[in-house]
Design a protein with these regions (language model features):
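Acidic, gly/ser/pro-rich intrinsically disordered tails
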Residues: 1, 14-20, 36-39, 54, ...
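Short aromatic-glycine-enriched beta-strand elements
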Residues: 17-30, 86-88
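Short, basic/aromatic beta-hairpin or loop at an interaction surface
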Residues: 38-46
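Beta-rich strand-turn-strand
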Residues: 49-85, 98-101
Length: 118
């Protein structure tokens, strides 16, 4: 199931490269919503991979308003106290600036050339 959130980056995206050279970027998005006079904030941890990760790291910064679409997964890990805890992560399939609040200059990503198999 696809999920879309709209909010602001709470930190600059952190890019890393895993063993096979694949790019990975992690960032957090704060989503504000109002119910009557009350305002609520929800925070979402987001992960993007590959060329999307590189584009996010090169283009977006803390405070930017973004639209993120992806799927939710649950990560389980052992905390410092030795307890297994769960964390929900939005694995991004698409990320972009919210053009209602910003302008963007789009540059197509360069595609890798594939050599013929013969």
């Amino acid at each position: 199931m696809s999920t879309t959130i709209i909010g602001r980056l709470t930190t600059d995206p952190e890019i890393k490269f895993i063993n096979n050279g694949m790019a990975l970027v992690n960032f957090s998005v704060a989503v504000n919503r109002k119910k009557g006079e009350e305002e609520y904030v929800s925070y979402f941890d987001v992960t993007a991979w590959g060329t999307l990760a590189q584009g996010v790291a090169d283009s977006l910064h803390k405070g930017d308003r973004v639209i993120v679409n992806g799927f939710l997964t649950q990560d389980r890990y052992e905390n410092k106290e030795g307890k297994t805890v769960g964390k929900v992560i939005l694995n991004a399939q698409a990320v972009g600036p919210d053009l209602q609040f910003a302008t963007a200059e789009v540059h197509s990503a360069k595609k890798k050339e594939v050599e013929p198999a013969f």
